[in-house]
From Swiss-Prot:
One Pfam assignment: LAGLIDADG_3
Residue ranges of domain DOD-type homing endonuclease in the record: 179-311, 780-927, 1348-1508
Underlying gene: rfcS
Source organism: Methanocaldococcus jannaschii (strain ATCC 43067 / DSM 2661 / JAL-1 / JCM 10045 / NBRC 100440) (Methanococcus jannaschii)
Similarity comment text for this entry: Belongs to the activator 1 small subunits family. RfcS subfamily.
Protein's name in the database: Replication factor C small subunit
Length: 1847
């Protein structure tokens, strides 16, 4: 069975982001009212995951099988209350994951208010009024199916509606229903009397009505009346009938008020009712059935009723011109609908029936259609190579056609997937055989295969390679079906891949792959490589999420029951509206509307407060937490005592069992096992235990155990960088978990049994209060677990009873010896065995000691009885010394196991707890152990050839080793051959050690050293790998748990210990200090709520954020998340200076196509992106316009860089200045996946180059060595064909005969092994190695190549040397920039060389210096030549623009031009206001004049693409042609050139500043002066003088005069010069400080922001913009709740003020010395300060410095400083004594002392250099201590070093 859909489609396409699901403005408005009334204080801002998506009260919905208005239903349930009301007896209809109609339970209902609605009308007559953010399931015009907010809908979109609906059917009299149909259609009941009339012109219908009336109503008097001037009728007088009509509310009812009675709507009698009603009021018009009614309710009921039979009807309104009344027409059209009506309802009237049959024709394909997402269908076609019909090209498919096509397609898909599964299964097995086994069975194999024995020996020794046929024969004999694998490989290559694809991955030629797969090849290793590659490709297909998604789409199309109704009208309504919604868990939709429509339910207010939800308040939000199940085993220390327990038992110890709302419990006496930095198992303290409830969990089974946990609890795994956390939901079968086998230290060797001492002690009673445990007694206690029992006579006289088989002499003797040695009284007897009580086959040894018996009873059982199933290993045993724990296990194994000690021991027990205890005890005692059903297995570490505990995951280890590959002296691949070539998933630590011994450590780089150190740690680790076997989801519905392990985040748990990631440490701590404690206190003043500021929310983990969310829901009154962002049209600059709108960047960032931007640091990594509407955070958007004309729109709290630092838009005013970076513009980022290098064309070029070098083709070459590469490949192909049939010498002869060349035997041997050389092949491989063949036009490297190419054409030279040298002459600054570009491409250049030069120019002698670099890179050299760069003198050979540039995108063209002008272009010249001189000049010989002109024409065309005008000028100088391309001299043209192209390298920065000056100058003329001129002309007629106007507008008087004369606006004389611009405006040489000339508020907008890694900034529209503080890393539920303000660190006085306030309230005497001490130890952290104060207060009411330093385990700073000064003065012994005092008396750790020493460095009276040395020494010591070195020794060594250092 192939599982296609991972989750419901309806769920998949529901809104997933906060922006999609929240309408915060209205909800917040209402919640504020609640807070003002103080009735629901916890509702404000601590809202649930989503709010809002609602409907108006008149929306119809089917609830409990009845059509009702949603408002009426919810008002009944909520009693008019706004907000959330729980319900458990409501059912509605909705669609499931396959688009099928089902009935669902409603969990709660919701009522609210809003000011805005969207009214939607559809083609079929549907009319919906929903909130703007209500999602509706839509089929877009592009074929996409998704939930879309109402405000985003467009006319032409298709709305999902059901094809049929379900009701809970009830019994109803069919004849009575028919009678009602007639009555409602053409009947009338008099209001005052018992008269009923039925008026109809059809005699048969009248007769039928009369028959039914007579039958149904016994008192009926019936009379038919025929009238002359009106329609005949049936007159009925019946009290019973009228009373029946009256009950239904139909008596005297007008035609516009009638409805279908609800009892009939839900019964099977509905068809009889409809037939009768359509007989009366229905008819045939054109090609449709039409029924007209004056009742809108009846019309809508009819549409619902018809859907019960799958009949889709249209509702149409018409105004009757005679009476001006609105009538509602039900229209049934389309043949399939008409046929369904005929089959299920039909007409009784023959005339109508006949007409109906006449209009049923072939289906109209243009009706009832769905728009197809052709991209998904095509993706399936391309990925699975499925053949499709031509229908795929059509945009719209009819419903029936769609189902037919997709069902056929699914059959083909399933077949292909099954075939791929079979191929995968076949390819999982490697094709390599064990030649050692072949050697052992050589004779047998020779007999069975017919291959000579000596030939097989040659194969074994590697002297000859077997052909594939012979290899298969040998493999078959060994029981290995390789033929099946090869067949699978061939099928996959031909059917699902290609030789080209496989060849590309293996860096082989297509022809080689074909030869290996299709011929009788000898290259079995190559086949194995192909197998592994194909297996990887198969797995990629089967795990392709896009493919799975596309198949899910097809499955949805094939099985859905949706009719897509086109939207024809959308209107926004404004006013006050009450809105309603229902919550349907999991599927989140229901059917409702005036005509049935699929509606999304809200996820609003899931858990606004516990009092609203009762016991279910957590159900919908706590499932996000990561936790393990209650019965998960764990080994802990409580108050220093070891205990093997479960989380459920910890719950009983730490939580109040009667308060389920208590979710966190801070603990200070709990420790768990975890791992340290060296991967060693250690005890670590727990800070908090967390619990919450969930419905479902995962059970993951692995080798020897299982673990139960929530889907997003993280499990620690190993990757190439070390330990990483991976969510349980992402774990796959075959992954490796980490467990441990370690020797955990134990100290106990004595038991204190005093508490078990008998009360009445006599001389005969042996008292053993201190019970020494040696190896014998440990063994005895272990044996008790296996074979012991305890018995008492009364409350005294206890016995410890051992029952052993009478044949177990060794055990009996050993036990007797131990009992005697310990001096216990004993009694022996024989007894019956458990199998035969009569047969005395067992011996009992009874130790007669009540004290020991009481101890055993209390500690060896679980408290639920003393049977075998209740046995446990006592907690005290876990604390014993290691040798004693091992002896205990031996005793247990000797009594109750099979197998041999020191090998595999199987211990059986009925007690699950005992087995788990055994596994944990073994693992902390250095013994590998596993758990199975009723059995624990121990694998002792001695004497075993294999142990799982010595194994680690192979994949990450191999990745690490590959990073060291070049520094390994030896064949490490042979050592790991089973992992590399046979797919073994694990590798032993011994092999890692073996490889590490081969590493040349001295030659390792810093990064390689890190990898080496990591491998070294892993080779010695106590961790090892266990493979995941099975994963399942199980029902749970109970508490799950987690623990927080500060500064470690890991712990071991499980029935077999697995390393888990703890999830909540950071969150718990932050919540307690930042939110929880703050929220607990009452608000001050009249406002009944407070604001919570979260100053570190962007650093919280996801789990911490969830914890924050829970606490907010429980305590907080107000929490809004404040973000600062830009509007979507802001263009941000990428590192290569392409532009992209920020909204487009975020889309590409999410798709991982872009991840870097340009900011103050240069290139920076983007960590996160966010989008939302600024109304959500209550920040309006402002537009800023600068004096250069640059504009940007940003929220009021967004920051921009100014000379004075970052400033918010709110702070900025007109005439303030912001900094601008003149980034290039005009080249947008566009996806362009064309490759810049065509390998086929390059190979062709290399072939021609080979011929120039003297290589020859077949026919001209005399020997193989002379051949061009292409013909060598032909020889290779032929050699491989012959290799299976002939010897090497025979092959040589045939090749020489066939091709007429000489070839050596060595060459033949190499060719048989697939080895081929050749000039062309060599450089194609080099291009691939460098990755240049993968570079696409949208890649930054394409721009680098283009830029270098332009510069080299200008100032570069390709020499004629054999090595392929490239010379580039330029300034030193330019060369440094060029070298950086070359490095990015993997090209190494020489150092920069400077030389003195002398030459003549125009008759003048010129002396100076020149600088250049050379590049010896033949691949780059050949590539440049391939692109058209001439070798030798360009002035003779001419210039070319490479085709890939000429036909490339604007990006590569711009970079080419920048390089070209950077080399040969003139730098812009500017003086005062004017600029000129941008041109490109080249001197060439006459021979290349025309070619150069062509080149310049091409450059001119390129410039035109950037709207830059230029012209070409040719002149003669010294018999050479100076060809110039001159940029036309006007400011606007220059500005276009400088802002869109500029120069590469050194000239670039100056050119940008010139460009920005021009921009300001032109904007001043076009914007500012224009406005001044207009205002001046208006005011010139007034009283003001011309001089006053000039002063007012800061312009010369003649400017005003010129405007009055009507002259063109010119630049006034007082405008700043360029020199003034550089002095006054330029900041840091690259930024321009520009004045804001306009600031305006433009309201709320959709806004965007990004977060960068190194620097909180990015360039947008030239502005230096501040990014947000990681808002997108905050989970949506937090974003929907919080207002985050970033705070700077607290000042000392602020902390002091707060501490004094607290001390006063708590009645404490806080001394000045105590206050200073708290400030010192808290390091500016208020949380720490308050905690220290509270801890100190527990010891004394007087808080002085002594008590502060005591409770915080800190030394006085003066003592630390004194110790450091003593050391620096050379008084080492005194300094060391003080150090020991700090460690012993103050209890300080080495890390604490180092931290304080580091803080004191600045206060020491030593020079700066000594301070640097001291900081370095402290850092080195800290590292050594962290790595596990002895603290005292390291700190003493540090003091010694300081003594030597001196002052």
């Amino acid at each position: 069975m192939v599982i296609i859909m991972e989750k419901p489609w309806v769920e998949k396409y529901r809104p997933k982001t906060l922006d999609d699901i929240v309408g915060q403005d209205e909800i917040v408005k209402r919640l504020k009212k609640y807070v003002e009334k103080k009735s629901m204080p916890h509702l404000l801002f601590s809202g649930p995951p989503g709010v809002g998506k609602c409907l108006t009260g008149d929306t119809k919905v089917i609830v409990n099988g009845e059509i009702r208005e949603i408002g009426e239903v919810i008002e009944e349930i909520s009693n008019g209350k706004f907000g959330v009301t729980l319900t458990n007896n409501l059912k509605v209809l909705g669609i499931d994951e396959d688009g099928k109609i089902r009935e669902f339970d409603v969990q709660y209902v919701y009522k609210d208010k809003t000011n805005t609605l969207i009214k939607i009308k559809t083609k079929m007559g549907r009319e919906l009024k929903v909130t703007t953010y209500h999602p509706l399931l839509i089929n877009h015009k592009n074929g996409e199916i998704k939930w879309e907010k109402a405000e985003n809908l467009k006319v032409g979109d298709k709305l999902a509606t059901p094809r049929y609906i379900l009701f809970n059917e009830s019994d109803y009299n069919e004849e009575l229903a028919e009678w009602l149909g007639y009555f409602i259609g053409d009947g009338h009941a008099d209001k005052e009397s018992n008269k009923i009339t039925f008026t109809n012109g059809d005699e048969k219908l009248r007769k039928r009505f009369a028959e039914l009336t007579e039958k149904l109503f016994k008192d009926a008097k019936i009379k038919e009346r025929i009238h002359k001037d009106r329609t005949p009728d049936i007159y009925v007088n019946s009290k019973e009938a009228v009373e029946f009509i009256d009950k239904l509310g139909l008596r005297g009812k007008k035609a516009d008020k009638v409805r279908i009675p609800k009892e009939i709507m839900r019964s099977d009698a509905l068809r009889a009712f409809l037939r009768a009603y359509f007989d009366c009021d229905g008819g045939i018009e054109k090609h449709s059935i039409v029924l007209s009614t004056a009742s809108k309710e009846m019309a809508e009921d009819l549409v619902y009723a018809l859907l019960r039979f799958g009949i889709i009807a249209k509702l149409r309104e018409k105004v009757n011109k005679n009476n001006n009344k609105v009538y509602y027409h039900i229209v049934i059209s389309n043949s399939s609908n008409l046929r369904t009506f005929l089959d299920n309802i039909g007409f009784s009237q023959e005339r109508k029936l006949k007409k109906l049959l006449e209009i049923i024709k072939d289906e109209n394909p243009n009706l009832d259609v769905i728009t197809i997402d052709k991209e998904k269908i095509r993706y399936i076609r391309d990925r699975l190579k499925v053949k499709l019909t031509r229908d795929i090209e059509k945009d719209n498919w009819s419903y029936n056609k769609c189902r037919k096509i997709t069902q056929e397609l699914l059959k083909e898909i399933y077949y292909r997937l099954e075939e791929l599964k079979e191929i995968e299964k076949a390819l999982e097995e490697n094709i390599l055989i064990d030649w050692d086994e072949v050697a052992e069975r050589r004779k047998e194999i020779a007999e069975k295969t017919g291959i000579r024995s000596d030939r097989i020996l040659e194969y074994i020794r590697g002297k000859r390679k077997p052909s594939l046929k012979n290899y298969i024969k040998i493999a078959n004999t060994l029981g290995k079906n390789i033929e099946k694998i090869i067949d699978a490989m061939r099928i996959f290559a031909k059917k699902y891949s290609s030789y080209a694809e496989i060849g590309k991955m293996l860096n082989m030629w297509n022809s080689s792959i074909k030869i290996y797969l299709e011929s009788n090849t000898q290259e079995i290793e190559k086949l194995e490589e192909i197998r592994k590659t194909e297996l990887k490709l198969v797995k990629e297909i089967l795990n392709d999420e896009k493919l799975i998604d596309s198949i899910g789409y097809v499955l949805f199309l094939a099985s859905n029951e949706i009719y897509w109704d086109e939207i024809v009208e959308i209107e926004q309504l404004n006013g006050e509206f009450t809105i309603y919604d229902l919550h349907v868990p999991r599927y989140h939709n229901f059917i409702g509307g005036n005509l049935p429509t699929i509606l999304h339910n809200t996820t609003a207010a899931l858990c606004l407060a516990r009092d609203l939800f009762g016991e279910n308040w957590r159900d919908n939000f706590l499932e996000l937490n990561a936790s393990v199940s209650k019965d998960t085993p764990i080994l802990v220390k409580i108050d220093g005592k070891v205990k093997r327990t479960t989380f459920e038992e910890l719950d009983k110890i730490y939580f109040e069992t009667n308060d389920e709302n208590e979710m966190y419990k801070k603990v200070d006496n709990l420790e768990v096992l975890t791992v340290d930095e060296n991967f060693r198992v250690r005890w670590r303290k727990v800070s908090t235990i967390i619990r919450h409830k969930v419905d479902k969990i995962l059970r993951i089974k692995f080798e020897g155990g299982y673990i139960e946990l929530t889907g997003n609890h993280s499990i620690m795994m190993l990757d190439e960088n070390g330990l990483v956390a991976k969510k349980a939901s992402d774990i796959k079968v075959g992954d490796c978990f980490l467990s441990f086998v370690a020797n955990i230290e134990g100290e106990k060797d004595r038991l204190d049994l005093k508490e078990f001492e008998p009360k009445d002690i006599t001389s005969r009673v042996k008292i053993i209060n201190d019970f020494d445990i040696d190896e014998d007694t440990a063994w005895m206690l272990g044996l008790y677990v296996a074979e012991g029992a305890v018995g008492f006579k009364g409350k005294t006289s206890g016995q410890v009873i051992y029952t052993l088989g009478s044949h177990e002499h060794d055990l009996i003797n050993k036990l007797n010896d131990i009992v005697d040695k310990k001096g216990f009284s004993k009694y022996e007897n024989f007894t019956g065995s458990g199998f035969d009580r009569k047969r005395l086959s067992a011996k009992q040894i009874r130790i007669l000691n009540t004290q020991l018996a009481r101890f055993v009873e209390e500690n060896f059982y679980d408290g639920n009885g003393r049977r075998a199933r209740n046995k446990r290993i006592p907690d005290i045993i876990f604390e014993l010394k290691e040798n004693l724990r091992v002896e205990f296990l031996k005793g247990l194994a000797d009594g109750d196991s099979s197998g041999n000690w020191r090998e595999v021991v199987r211990i059986s027990s009925k007690s699950d707890n005992l087995l788990i205890d055994t596994v944990w005890l073994a693992r902390i005692s250095g013994i590998e152990s596993s758990i199975f059903e009723n059995e624990a297995r121990l694998i002792w570490k001695g004497g075993m050839k294999w142990k799982k505990s010595n194994l680690l995951p192979a994949e990450p280890i191999i990745k690490m080793i590959k990073k060291l590959e070049n520094k390994i002296n030896g064949n490490w691949r042979y050592i790991l051959r089973h992992q590399l070539y046979e797919g073994k998933k694990r590798v032993s630590k011994d092999k890692i050690k073996q490889i590490l011994e081969m590493v040349n450590v001295e030659k390792l780089s810093d990064k390689e050293k890190e990898v080496y150190d990591l491998l070294k740690k892993l080779s010695k680790t106590e961790l090892y790998a266990l493979v995941v076997k099975e994963i399942e989801i199980i029902d749970y519905n109970d508490f799950v748990y987690d623990v927080s392990v500060p500064n470690n985040e890991m712990f071991f748990a499980g029935n077999v210990p697995i390393l888990l990631h703890n999830s909540d440490e950071r969150g718990i701590d932050v919540i307690r200090t930042k939110v929880k404690d703050f929220a607990r206190t009452k608000p001050i003043g009249d406002v009944p709520f407070k604001i919570i500021f979260l100053d570190e929310s962007d650093a919280l983990t996801a789990d911490a954020q969830n914890a924050l969310r829970r606490t907010m829901e429980k305590y907080s009154d107000v929490c809004r998340f404040i973000l600062s962002c830009l509007t979507g049209d802001a263009k941000i600059t990428l590192p290569d200076e392409r532009e992209i709108k920020i909204e487009d960047f975020i889309k590409m960032f999410e798709e991982r196509k872009l991840k870097h931007v340009l900011n103050r640091n240069g290139e920076d990594l983007v960590l996160a992106g966010v989008k939302f509407n600024s109304k959500i955070v209550n920040h309006k958007v402002y537009r800023l316009v600068l004096e250069s004309g640059r504009e940007i729109e940003a929220t009021g709290d967004h920051k921009f860089l100014t000379r004075d630092g970052w400033k918010e838009v709110y702070e900025l005013k007109e005439d303030d200045e912001v900094l601008v970076y003149p980034a290039l513009e005009g080249v947008g980022f566009e996806v362009d996946e064309r490759r810049i290098i065509g390998l086929n064309e390059f190979y062709e070029f290399l072939t021609n180059y080979e011929i120039k070098l003297g290589y020859k083709p077949l026919g001209k070459a005399k020997s193989y060595k002379e051949l061009i590469t292409r013909d060598k490949e032909k020889i290779l192909s032929r050699v491989l064909e012959l290799s299976d049939k002939y010897s090497k010498s025979e092959i040589r002869r045939k090749i020489e005969e066939e091709f007429g060349i000489k070839i050596s035997l060595t060459t033949i041997k190499n060719l048989i092994n697939g080895k081929i050389d050749g000039f062309a092949l060599k450089y194609v491989r080099k291009i691939k190695e460098l990755g240049w063949d993968e570079i696409t036009y949208d890649d930054e490297k394409a721009g680098i190549f283009a830029r270098l190419l332009g510069f080299i054409i200008g100032d570069g030279h390709l020499s004629k040397s054999k090595e392929g040298r490239i010379l580039i002459t330029a300034t030193i600054n330019e060369l440094e920039g060029i070298k950086k570009d070359l490095e990015k491409l993997g090209i190494k250049a020489s150092n920069i060389i400077e030389k003195d030069i002398e030459h003549k120019l125009d008759g003048r002698e010129i002396k100076g210096k020149t600088s250049f670099i050379y590049i010896n890179n033949k691949a780059f050299y050949l590539l440049l030549n391939f692109w058209g760069v001439e070798i030798g003198n360009k002035t003779i050979n001419g210039y070319n623009i490479p085709k890939w540039i000429k036909y490339g995108n604007k990006f590569v063209k711009r970079e080419f031009l920048r390089g070209l002008f950077g080399a040969d272009g003139t730098k812009p010249y500017i003086k005062k206001y004017n600029i000129n001189g941008i041109k490109l000049g080249i001197r060439v010989e006459n021979i290349s004049k025309d070619k150069t002109l062509e080149f310049f024409e091409e450059v001119k065309k390129m410039l035109e693409e950037f709207e830059v005008e230029s012209y070409i000028k040719v002149s003669k100088i010294d018999n050479k042609n100076l060809t110039e391309l001159i940029v036309k001299a006007n400011n606007k043209n220059y500005l276009k050139y400088l802002s869109r192209i500029s120069y590469a390298y050194e000239k670039d920065n100056f050119a940008r500043l010139v460009g920005e000056y021009l921009r300001i100058k032109e904007a001043y003329k076009d914007i500012i002066l224009k406005e001044i001129a207009e205002n001046a002309l208006k005011e010139a007629d007034g009283e003001k003088s011309l001089r006053e106007l000039a002063r007012k507008y800061n312009v010369p008087v003649d400017f005003i005069i010129n405007q009055l004369k009507g002259k063109d606006i010119g630049l006034p004389r007082n405008f700043m010069t360029f020199e003034e611009f550089l002095k006054e405006k330029v900041v840091d040489g690259k930024y321009v400080s520009e004045r804001i000339i306009k600031k305006e508020c433009i309201g709320y907008r959709d806004v965007y922001d990004i977060t960068c890694h190194k620097d909180p900034s990015f360039i947008a529209n030239g502005f230096v913009s501040h990014n947000c503080n990681y808002p997108s890393k905050i989970i949506p539920p937090i974003q929907s709740r919080c207002a985050v303000f970033r705070f700077s660190p607290l000042k000392k006085e602020d902390i002091a003020k707060k501490l004094k306030e607290i001390a006063e309230k708590e009645g404490l005497n806080l001394t000045e010395s105590g206050l200073e001490a708290i400030i010192y130890v808290s390091e500016g952290d208020m949380r720490k300060a308050i905690n220290v104060l509270q801890t100190a207060a527990a010891l004394s009411d007087v808080i002085d410095d002594e008590i502060v330093y005591k409770v915080s385990s800190r030394a006085r700073p003066e003592e630390v400083k004194k110790m450091m000064e003593l050391a620096l003065d050379g008084k080492f012994m005194e300094a060391r004594d003080l150090l020991y005092k700090l460690m012993v008396e103050w209890g300080m750790s080495g890390e604490d002392i180092l931290n304080q020493m580091f803080r004191e460095i600045n206060s020491l009276d030593i020079d700066e250099r000594k301070k640097v040395e001291l900081a370095d020494a402290i850092g080195e010591t800290d590292f050594r201590i962290v790595e596990g070195a002895n603290e005292r020794i390291q700190l003493s060594a540090l003091l010694a070093k300081m003594a030597l250092m001196g002052r």
